[in-house]
Each structure stands twice: as structure tokens, then as C-alpha cells.
């Protein structure tokens, strides 16, 4: 499981873009995992795209995660599946996938992070850290809550929501080591360059923290 720079797809960024070329550019820029999240496609369309993305992510030694759809995740042998509170319960998903893949779970409050410690999930997506244009209905939690989430969770925290290249140092200093990004990469014309900016900011901040003895 390598979710250091975790790209999450979104319908609105692929209206005039080729999915595979765009994802490959992001992978070349340093993305370590890709979550396939689309709503306006048929199951067959999603399956066919995921088959190609599975090949592409393997080429770059990156993880492939499928949002919501456990059936599709199993069908293409994805590395992980991500679920939320309105999806199948984590216990049921674990019974279905066994140890074939890891499970991610969404938490939108510190209380939900605490409850998730008892669930059979492998990482927790926590946010929204900042205001975001990717989702219409979201809960803003902020950086201080992120710091606390990292402290109280025994499971890896993936921070999500409005994370642009210039905000990466702040979330890394807050203790987060896994960064989920959508608009921060896909919102730019040069996707590879945007991914490189995220990666550079991450590595430079981590290096500085190590020099200061804060890691």
C-alpha cells in the first residue's frame, strides 16, 4: 500500500481529456496510487477502463484503487477498494475481498476516525481539509483536526480536500504522510508538472522536518 501521492479521478476533469494519457502523465510525475472514481459511466465502460488502468498502474509500480465498486475491484485485481458510510459495511466488504486487497474508509470527523479504529479497514480518508471544488456537499474539518486525527489513529490517515501544491507543506507538517489529490493535479493543464510539484513539496518538507528532528 503506497498512498503517498494518491490521485483521485473525477468526471469533470475528463470531459475533453483522454483518461489514459492523463493518468500516465500523472504517474510519470510521481503519483503513487490512482483511485478510479466515476459516476456517469456504465458498469461495462468502467470495467474496460479499469482493465487498461490496471496495466498502466502496474507499468509504473503504482496502486490501483476502485471507489465503491467491490465487484469491479475484484474483477480487475485492484490493489484496494475505497468505501464510504453509504456503501457496503466494511465487515461485509472484508468478507468479500478477504486479504486480496486493502480497504479504505472515509471519515469526516474525529469521532468517525475513532470509530473506524474498530473497523476491518486499512486506511482512513480524512477531510475535507480545505475548501474543495471537487465535491459539492462536504464537511470542512481543517488542519488542526488533521493533526489530531493523525495522533489518535492507529491506521494510516490519508488527508483529502482542496490540497494544492502550495498546501502540501502544511499537511505534511501536521503529520500526514499520505495525500489525496484531485484538482491539485487534474485541475492543471500540465498534469505531469502538477504531480511533480506535489511530490517536490512533499519531499522537501519531509527533508526539512527530518533535519529539525521532528520526524
Curated annotation (Swiss-Prot):
It catalyses: 2-[(2R,5Z)-2-carboxy-4-methylthiazol-5(2H)-ylidene]ethyl phosphate + 4-amino-2-methyl-5-(diphosphooxymethyl)pyrimidine + 2 H(+) = thiamine phosphate + CO2 + diphosphate; 2-(2-carboxy-4-methylthiazol-5-yl)ethyl phosphate + 4-amino-2-methyl-5-(diphosphooxymethyl)pyrimidine + 2 H(+) = thiamine phosphate + CO2 + diphosphate; 4-methyl-5-(2-phosphooxyethyl)-thiazole + 4-amino-2-methyl-5-(diphosphooxymethyl)pyrimidine + H(+) = thiamine phosphate + diphosphate. GO terms for biological process: thiamine biosynthetic process; thiamine diphosphate biosynthetic process. GO terms for molecular function: magnesium ion binding; thiamine-phosphate diphosphorylase activity. GO terms for cellular component: cytoplasm. 4-amino-2-methyl-5-(diphosphooxymethyl)pyrimidine binds at residues 35-39, 67, 106, 135. Keywords: Magnesium, Metal-binding, Thiamine biosynthesis, Transferase. Its EC number is 2.5.1.3. Its cofactor is Mg(2+). InterPro entries: Aldolase_TIM (IPR013785), ThiamineP_synth_sf (IPR036206), ThiamineP_synth_TenI (IPR022998), TMP_synthase (IPR034291). Mg(2+) binds at residues 68, 87. 2-[(2R,5Z)-2-carboxy-4-methylthiazol-5(2H)-ylidene]ethyl phosphate binds at residues 132-134, 162. Pathway: Cofactor biosynthesis; thiamine diphosphate biosynthesis; thiamine phosphate from 4-amino-2-methyl-5-diphosphomethylpyrimidine and 4-methyl-5-(2-phosphoethyl)-thiazole: step 1/1. It holds the Pfam family TMP-TENI. Binds 1 Mg(2+) ion per subunit. Condenses 4-methyl-5-(beta-hydroxyethyl)thiazole monophosphate (THZ-P) and 2-methyl-4-amino-5-hydroxymethyl pyrimidine pyrophosphate (HMP-PP) to form thiamine monophosphate (TMP). NCBIfam families: thiE. Belongs to the thiamine-phosphate synthase family. HAMAP family: TMP_synthase. This is Thiamine-phosphate synthase 1. The gene is thiE1.
